[in-house]
Amino acid sequence: MSERKRRLMVMAGGTGGHVFPGLAVAHYLQSQGWDIRWLGTADRMEAQLVPKHGIEIEYIRISGLRGKGVKALIAAPIRIIKAIFQARRIMKRYQPDAVLGMGGYVSGPGGVAAWSCGIPVVLHEQNGIAGLTNRWLSKIAKRVLQAFPGAFANAPVVGNPVRDDVLALEAPAERLKGREGAVRVLVIGGSQGARILNHTMPVVAGLLGERVTIWHQAGKGSESDTKLRYQNELSKNSVKSEYKVTEFIDDIAQAYQWADVVVCRSGALTVSEIAAAGLPAIFVPFQHKDRQQYWNALPLENAGAARIIEQNDLTPEAIADTLENWDRHQLMLMAEKAQSVAITDATERVANVIIEVAKK
């Protein structure tokens, strides 16, 4: 009889920042002969994305509470308990050797269910400030890992697992060598876009004209409006500037290869990808009570690879002045500094902890 494959259940959902790092670890362990199963929710992005990657997915019913009102808060304990029992049934049927929690609503009930079944939980916090669910789960997890220092006092810093195509990009010295002319500005508002960038960057194009070429990911439903804003600002200032606006960039590695500098939010995965790619950045952190995105971006600013502009301080002039002050020599230095702080073997580090925990 052949030996039973090791089994991992990945708990991750809701946003690309949770799902893509989970997929990176899943694919790595599949290449090592592991069987992978995913725990998610049927109405979030993992339901479409994970099966496309050849991984079987199971669902529990759970959602966030923010903005749901008093009735939802009262019903929450019952819904959470039901979700835990749904997850327990899945765990008992699949019998994983370890469970990896990468974040999203599903991780809370899934982590408790795994712990109650005696299955070791490995927790990975992608952000510089730990979310409430991960703070709770850290008390029952076998191992806790963090992408950035500061989320947990004593957890090892392993970085964020990044997609292979981003890791495969040329080093900045090769990629940026010989470039001249307009600075190539990549604008990323996250998979959902960022309205403030959609409103601000067309004005920046109007201020800088032919000095910049812009590739702008506007987010779902925002492409037409953002294109119109570019047209109006360039016409108003009687200047020309090349720009491309899309709802979503399917091949982000190609976009990083093209870019000289990135203007974006500072979600955990975005920051980690920009560091791995070796790109200078202007980060505009999403305003959250924990300032989570600010802390994500701070290591790159401290390294001299980026500038953080808080949303309250954001003006078109602030971005335009920053871009004008960064000549090509400066951009090259910043790109190399960004890559110097990247943790490029994060996938292997997380996978090795899972392998270690599963053997015990």
UniProtKB/Swiss-Prot annotation:
Keywords: Cell cycle, Cell division, Cell inner membrane, Cell membrane, Cell shape, Cell wall biogenesis/degradation, Glycosyltransferase, Membrane, Peptidoglycan synthesis, Transferase. Pathway: Cell wall biogenesis; peptidoglycan biosynthesis. This is UDP-N-acetylglucosamine--N-acetylmuramyl-(pentapeptide) pyrophosphoryl-undecaprenol N-acetylglucosamine transferase. It is an enzyme of class 2 (transferase). Cell wall formation. Catalyzes the transfer of a GlcNAc subunit on undecaprenyl-pyrophosphoryl-MurNAc-pentapeptide (lipid intermediate I) to form undecaprenyl-pyrophosphoryl-MurNAc-(pentapeptide)GlcNAc (lipid intermediate II). HAMAP family: MurG (MF_00033). GO terms for cellular component: plasma membrane. It catalyses: di-trans,octa-cis-undecaprenyl diphospho-N-acetyl-alpha-D-muramoyl-L-alanyl-D-glutamyl-meso-2,6-diaminopimeloyl-D-alanyl-D-alanine + UDP-N-acetyl-alpha-D-glucosamine = di-trans,octa-cis-undecaprenyl diphospho-[N-acetyl-alpha-D-glucosaminyl-(1->4)]-N-acetyl-alpha-D-muramoyl-L-alanyl-D-glutamyl-meso-2,6-diaminopimeloyl-D-alanyl-D-alanine + UDP + H(+). Its main location: membrane. It comes from the Bacteria. Its EC number is 2.4.1.227. The lineage of its organism: Bacteria, Pseudomonadati, Pseudomonadota, Gammaproteobacteria, Enterobacterales. UDP-N-acetyl-alpha-D-glucosamine binds at T15, G16, G17, N127, R163, S191, I249, A268, L269, T270, V271, S272, E273, Q293. It is found in: Cell inner membrane. GO terms for molecular function: UDP-N-acetyl-D-glucosamine:N-acetylmuramoyl-L-alanyl-D-glutamyl-meso-2,6-diaminopimelyl-D-alanyl-D-alanine-diphosphoundecaprenol 4-beta-N-acetylglucosaminlytransferase activity; undecaprenyldiphospho-muramoylpentapeptide beta-N-acetylglucosaminyltransferase activity. It holds the Pfam family Glyco_tran_28_C. Belongs to the glycosyltransferase 28 family. MurG subfamily. It is a peripheral membrane protein. GO terms for biological process: carbohydrate metabolic process; cell division; cell wall organization; lipid glycosylation; peptidoglycan biosynthetic process; regulation of cell shape. It comes from Proteus mirabilis (strain HI4320). InterPro entries: GlcNAc_MurG, Glyco_trans_28_C, GlycoTrans_28_N.
